[in-house]
Amino acid sequence: MFKSGSGSLKRSGSISSVKSFSGDSEKGLPPISRGSVSIASQNSEPLIVPASSSSFAATSDFVPEKTKSEGNLKDKSSVITGNFGSSGPINAHTNQNADGDRLVENLLLKESSKGRGSGTSDARHTATDSRLSQEVKQSFSEENAGGNDLNTGRGSHGTGDGVEQHYKFDCEEGMSAYHKRVVDTFFKYFEYSAEDGHSTLYSDVMFLSGHGDLGLLVMSRYQELMTLRVRSAIYGIFCYLQALTAYLTYFDAKVGQAIMLDEELEKYEIRLDVAQDDDPIVFQITTGVFTSGVAHDLRKLTQILEAFSLER
């Protein structure tokens, strides 16, 4: 469960999530390049979380870099605007599932029908694309009458020791039905295996704020068998959006942008504009190369973000 603190929020702080990845030495698998998901105010120094174990990396190596110039950024940007809040206008998503469902379905099916080009003609991806349309159609053709049974297609990803259930209550409880429907559909798409089999991901996720006025919002540790690390980045995104909107209402982010900073390095960032401040919150995703399809998968991630940019 999220734990809220008391007191005023200091804008000089940051919220950071750090993820480290390990390979399988017995199987000869190399360590997977570490990735990070971070949110920080552009005017402040990021909060440094010291390493507490071999699988927990300090944030100092993964702090989003200052953008070199707005001009360069705009040249490579794919800007997406829309409402990212979980209260107020975001409820329109849950009340207008038909519109949202059609948008997400069209986005995913359109991309699926395009194919991947010569650079990503992987047979695994082709097989995944072939079943994507049916899974998406099935998911969005089922009406969410009860509003709660939205976690299908995930049981096989847990470790069998209650970790998945622990994550569910930590991060998913406050998600809107619309968020869950999109996430579930997106996760199904990533159920293909990595070339060298499953990789074990150890994640330490911390939600921290300011100089302690709100204190530790959430600290959850979980490990899960993952078929592709991009799924972890998606976990982080929706956890963060939920934490920001549900417990850091001071930010009251109304408009978001998904920007591709560097396609070759697979570097993306999300900017959340803050109503009370001209300074946007920067939410950056950086990953290394793991499979030939990672760049494509991150483009899918951008499409998911676009699904939340419905004009109201």
Swiss-Prot record:
Compositionally skewed regions (Low complexity) per UniProt: 1-23
Biased composition (Polar residues): 78-98
Function: Constituent of viral factories. Binds to ssRNA and dsRNA.
Protein name as annotated: Non-structural protein 12A
The organism's taxonomic lineage, starting at the top: Viruses, Riboviria, Orthornavirae, Duplornaviricota, Resentoviricetes
Residue numbers spanned by region Disordered: 1-37, 62-99, 111-161
First-listed, main subcellular location of the protein, grouped into a coarse class: host cell
Subcellular location as annotated: Host cytoplasm
Domain of life: Viruses
Biased composition (Basic and acidic residues): 63-77, 122-134
UniProtKB keywords: Host cytoplasm
GO cellular component, one term: host cell cytoplasm
Family listed: Belongs to the phytoreovirus non-structural protein Pns12A family.
